[in-house]
Each structure stands twice: as structure tokens, then as C-alpha cells.
């Protein structure tokens, strides 16, 4: 890689000051929409991804792209902000399937993410090269939720999660 290319990449990286800007340059989508992500299909994701608040709640219909938004936000917080993140789904089975089908697909199609997660990339734990952790857990087992201190969390399909999920997750936030 030439000096000019490294300089150019450095300038681009410094301009990636929001979750959506970062995603547009770093996240490649798998089929059926291969290539760098854009928000044309789901423009409402931009606002949700770039909110800088302590807590964000989204009431939504099915198939609106918010699982992808949660996934992207989790990757951004872990990779770019070097924060530990907990991603919660209703059951451990769903969490495992989601990890393999969605997280791994995004990581495998995004060259910079492949490099970022090459050391530890298991079903329930993904670790960046700078040692930030992304935990993927089901809500049914409280043991899986209480054993990880994190600074950010995403609860996906909250209405299908165990009753005490929000309380357990809030206790984990440091």
C-alpha cells in the first residue's frame, strides 16, 4: 500500500464520525443486496443509528430492517468506539442462528471487519483486535446476561424476550 493510499484512507477514516458514515464505508452487505451498505431501502435507519442518547426504543413492524440497524450499531460501537456490547435475542437458539447467519455474513463480506474479528469469532462472542467484546446472548438464561459487563446493549425482538430481560440488561451496563 502506497503512502498516498494510506494518507487517503486516514482522511476518510477521520470523516467517519457517525454510525451511518462508518457503515457506508466499512460494511458490505451479503446477497441479495451485495456491496457497501446504503440506506436507500430503509432511510429511517439513519436517524436511529445516529441518535446519541443513553436509551433508544423503536416500535416497529416486521421486516423493516431494524435487526440490521441493531447489528450495525453493535459493530460500530465495538469496532469504532472500542466498547463492549451485548446483543440480546429471545432465546439462545435464535441468538446462535442470528450470529451465524447475520453477524458472520456481514463480517465475512466486509474486508475490514474480517481483519478486525480474525482472532476470536465464535457464535456467542466476537472480539476485535483491540479487545472490545461483542456478546450475542439469548434472554431466557439470566446467567448468560449477568456475566458480562458492557457499555452498550441492543435487545432485538424485545416483545418475545423473557420478562426480566430489560432489568438484567440494565444491570450490566457500566
Predicted features by range, described:
Residues 2-174:
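Phosphate/NTP-binding elements of NTP-utilizing enzymes
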